[in-house]
Amino acid sequence: MRVLGIETSCDETGIAVYDDKLGLLSHALYSQVKLHADYGGVVPELASRDHVRKIVPLIRQALKNANTDIADIDGIAYTKGPGLIGALLVGACVGRSLAFAWNKPAIGVHHMEGHLLAPMLEEDAPEFPFVALLVSGGHSMLVKVDGIGLYAVLGESVDDAAGEAFDKTAKLMGLDYPGGPRLAKLAAKGEPAGYQFPRPMTDRPGLDFSFSGLKTFTANTIAAEPDDEQTRANIARAFEEAVVDTLAIKCRRALKQTGYNRLVIAGGVSANTRLRETLAEMMTSIGGRVYYPRGEFCTDNGAMIAFAGLQRLKAGQQEDLAVKGQPRWPLDTLPPLA
């Protein structure tokens, strides 16, 4: 089976062609980072309009690079949610329209299920069951995964997600958009010594996350310290260490609670080098393994949507002709494969 995947949940237009026998045949990605940089964040209306401009040329490019024509496509998968409703509807409209015109089945994919399954695109893919840490600009959650669609959310962010905290803290430090990667780059030059940043919600039972207080603590520290490059780097490092330690502590608890020894990390923040190092060390110390997608598939992309959609289309799941987008969509409401 060969599936065309379409991702337009936020500020990246991602298109891919995935074959269940040959693997990933092509993927094309357009990022709107430059478009939104002047505003310090994603402007939903601008994002939607840019998806409209880019999506059809990218589909043509992906099909050409995959040496695939319409007759070779067996189904279409598009991101249905969660995300920005205008951006979601662009992908949903195009995906449903192509499915109708080409007489192909189509399915709306959960964006976070795409991230969760992204490590399956790698040669050394994890086997079920495992615990997944999904960390991005909009989500931070720990999920017990027993199979595709067999999800139990163990904990999630009650306010700011980890990626959102990175971006907002970077803005406080005067760093350009997108802030998360720039803060991590600055942190690599710093030393956390001398700062005692809190590890939020680790002093109590449970697996939920909260990063808004840590952001406020960082803002107060910035205001109280000298405004020089090394001090800013040290504060960035202390902030990063606090976030990473918090995520690691919660992951260890989730693994102990489930009895699993495989950990998947996915989402934009999973590209963070310090997070990867810390979780790799932790899993080695407890005799487990950690899995994550390659860097280009940590952020939003069409490949993960094509892969996730293919699994459900193969199981006979598809949707009607209605164009739907779901800005909010709990992951654990998804049905299992038939």
From Swiss-Prot:
Q: Which of the seven top EC classes does this enzyme belong to? A: transferase
Q: GO MF annotations for this entry?
A: iron ion binding; N(6)-L-threonylcarbamoyladenine synthase activity
Residues involved in substrate binding? 134-138, 167, 180, 272
How cofactor binds (record note)?
A: Binds 1 Fe(2+) ion per subunit.
Query: Where does the sequence pass through the membrane?
Result: none
Q: Where does Fe cation bind?
A: 111, 115, 300
Instruction: Tell me yes or no: is Acyltransferase among this UniProt entry's keywords.
Output: yes
Q: What is its EC number?
A: 2.3.1.234
Q: Which GO terms describe its cellular component?
A: cytoplasm
Q: What is its main location?
A: cytoplasm
Enzymatic reactions = L-threonylcarbamoyladenylate + adenosine(37) in tRNA = N(6)-L-threonylcarbamoyladenosine(37) in tRNA + AMP + H(+)
Q: What SUPFAM superfamilies does this protein map onto? A: Actin-like ATPase domain
Q: Does the keyword Transcription apply?
A: no
Domain of life of the organism encoding this protein: Bacteria
Biological process terms from the Gene Ontology for this record are: tRNA threonylcarbamoyladenosine modification
User: Where found?
Assistant: Cytoplasm
Cofactor section: Fe(2+)
User: What keywords tag this UniProt record?
Assistant: Acyltransferase, Cytoplasm, Iron, Metal-binding, Transferase, tRNA processing
Instruction: List the residue ranges forming a coiled coil, or say none.
Output: none
Q: What does this protein do?
A: Required for the formation of a threonylcarbamoyl group on adenosine at position 37 (t(6)A37) in tRNAs that read codons beginning with adenine. Is involved in the transfer of the threonylcarbamoyl moiety of threonylcarbamoyl-AMP (TC-AMP) to the N6 group of A37, together with TsaE and TsaB. TsaD likely plays a direct catalytic role in this reaction.
Q: Which family does it belong to?
A: Belongs to the KAE1 / TsaD family.
Name of protein: tRNA N6-adenosine threonylcarbamoyltransferase
Q: Which gene encodes it?
A: tsaD
